[in-house]
Amino acid sequence: MSRSVISLERSTEAKKAAACPLEVIVSEAAKVIAPLWPISAFIARHPWMGMEDKSFVDAADRLQEAYGIDLYPPMAVFHAALSKGEIDVSFIERRLQRWLDDEPLPAPRHEAERLCRALLWNDAVPEEALQMPKLIELAAAMPLRSVSIRTRSVRLGLEKRLDQQMIKWCKLFYDRGEAVWALPHREHGFYGSWRRLAPLDPSLSKEERKRLFDWPHHPEEALQRALEQLGVQDEEAVAYLEAHLLALPGWAGMMVWQSRRAGDEIGGLINYLAVRLSLEWVFTAPHLPLKEEENEDDRAVGPLLAAWIHWGGMTLDDWRRLPLEDRQARLVFADRFWRIGRRHLWLEAWEDTYEAKLKEAVLTRQPEEPKEQAAAQLLFCIDVRSEPFRRHVEAVGPFETYGCAGFFGLPIQTRVLDSDDAHPSCPAIVAPRHEINETASPETAAPYRRRRDLFRFVGRTFKKIKRHLLAGLLLPEMSGPWLGLHTIARSAAPAWAGQAIHQAEMSAQQKPKTTLSLDCQGHDETTGLPIGLTKEEQVQYVKQLLVNIGLTSSFAPLVVVCGHESETTNNPYASALDCGACGGAAGAFNARVFAALANLPHVRDGLAKEGIVIPDETVFVAAEHITTVDELRWVEVPPLSEAAEAAFRQLKQALAGVSRQANAERMAKLPHVGAMPRDPVAEARRRAVDWSEIRPEWGLAGNAAFLIGRRALTKGVHLDGRVFLHSYDWREDPTGEALAGIIAGPATVGQWINLQYYASTVAPNYYGSGDKTTQTVTGGIGVMQGNGSDLLAGLPWQSVAASDREWFHSPLRLLVIIEAPFSYIERLLDENSEFRRKVQNGWLRLASIDPDSGAWVNWEAGRLASVQQR
């Protein structure tokens, strides 16, 4: 019953793409994949960002039916959630009734309802219903077709060889210094390099190499010719190229990322597809043209027909009397509901149950504004891991916390001391506008550079010896005793050895006191970006963040700007645990820049002219929340005023208890730890330095909601580390500009993170990266399973599941909640068509809380339609 039997008309995309230029066809096909960043700057990616013009249901139907990619959890997961109380049965019934109201039904309401309710709760039609002889006879007479897309190589069983060839060439092309020999002709692009080398490839037969003799040297020409030689018709070109992109979406996604980085939207994909389809033609040429594929599959009709007879209240005679069109419509209806509809209703019921519990937790208490002046105000990233830490900080003293995107509104790329490369320290959807450099005086930098150069020399020498043909034979004898001791120590006493090695590395890499290029100092020669900021820009960036989070008055003597970082060992996915808003890097640099800007006298003067008066006694300091050990580390503490010094001492004294409480809460969720570790801080530190630890922390697993509003709304509420918290005060935002910026930036990043976790959970073999213990880092850019697989784009299974059978992450679409008047939400949806489309098509959910009445309003399709018709 899982096989598709729907006969579809030509898709709208196919009709548009027929007879279109090749670039248009490739652009349309590219919507099924997403860019993939290198793993050193792992950024959460929304795998279906190009498909948001379709509804979530239609995208799921299309991917499952045509390519076998399932976007919904299996029924066993829904039943497990039901047994744990995470799904309320009443919501399932409510969603079913609403669905029946909205859907065109091929049968009387009572018959369709009986069928759907039975399919909701049953995994299969009873065997006796399937074995009725007359039913089998009727099923065999139904001319229904499957619509799965099968490329020529798949039909001939050559897809594995084609994938192996593509993996080999992609690894060579993208290598970042790992390979001993660099790929020749790389300057000619992916296709150009392959075209020059493929005729010499010994893995191709003599006949196959001969076929490439007069093959085009230009990628567009090669792709066009390959489509013609393979017999791909214009109307099927988009679907055919989609199938090839989805065969290895990781490598194709890397091609998209590199191409966009170079300012060419689809040039890289044309190169990639030109190589792939050229190879496909080379392999399949002796068998072309293929006979037209037979799509009929009478066997799949039986369970659908049996479902109507067994649960729909029909007899076989009733079925025979139906016109052929009605029978077909009923089968299509049952098939789509079985494959997609029923699980979508279960998903919505799961989401509704979570929303109801969150609504109760938030609205049962009256929001209270702070009654006393805070001693310290702390600005945290919206990351869900900040929520427990913020809650515990606020509980131990006169401290206020705020949430914002962890790049603190600074569209910068950063260049740390002596680095050759600059890192975009802002979200992937934001283009850097400035570069900030870290510098040190020659006197203080000299000792640091000597230590650094010594470590680099040792590392390079070891690497060269390891790769040398003869010297490599001596390396085990030379290094064996030392590496053996290292292995024994890290395995027998992971906490002690890991901590000792970590301390040694920190001491060796300890940087001298550095300064930041905050003021304008010309332009970067490579990127052309201005180094530093003008005085007006400095004022505006600080103002923008303070207004966005509603911190424009009542400043505490101490304001702590907290970036965040994760510290782990032997973890290729380390950047996935760092700050996504900082481009997959630690947030300390941005925190330091913002704090320094906010302390500048001319910035304070500029803010005062804008109506934001920061007292002279208020000092901004930079810190970093280490999420693996729930510790706050100081990045830069300038000279403090007397009041700020007192607040600093008070906060430091409270942080030890905060760390213990936050770690105890977090450790209890990790498998094999127990409800309450004897020493949660020690356990957290062990996991951070243990090189065998596959799950040092849960990261952002469990994320489910994004709340935009005052902290008074949620202060003291236990949100279980599942909610992104962005501070916002609608009273400070009469034009709605700040809200629009939060939705366009942080909320969109939150949606990407949410759908990355969703995809890695529901389709781990496709959108995840499998078992972390069997992965291999390849070319310095990503990971594979073993030494020959797709470039894995998602999260490892250990990031979303406690075991092979137990999921930790609940795959729910992000619920965005905004505390603002009704008119603010209407204006937002009216002006932001992209956000409205996300909500209307089900890629995220939207609710709002009226600040005056406390009413919780759901913004679903019907309400959105009324907004559009205003």
Swiss-Prot record:
Instruction: Relate the assembly described in the record.
Output: Forms a complex with DabB.
Q: Which UniProt keywords apply?
A: Cell membrane, Membrane, Metal-binding, Transport, Zinc
Topology within the bilayer: Peripheral membrane protein
- A molecular function (GO) term: zinc ion binding
Instruction: State its cofactor.
Output: Zn(2+)
User: In which compartments does the protein localize?
Assistant: Cell membrane
> Which InterPro entries does its entry note?
DabA
**Where, in this chain's numbering, is Zn(2+) bound?**
C381, D383, H564, C579
Function (record text): Part of an energy-coupled inorganic carbon pump.
**Gene Ontology cellular component annotations, sorted alphabetically:** plasma membrane
The record's family statement is:
Belongs to the inorganic carbon transporter (TC 9.A.2) DabA family.
Instruction: Kindly report the protein's main subcellular placement as a broad class.
Output: membrane
Protein name per its UniProtKB record = Probable inorganic carbon transporter subunit DabA
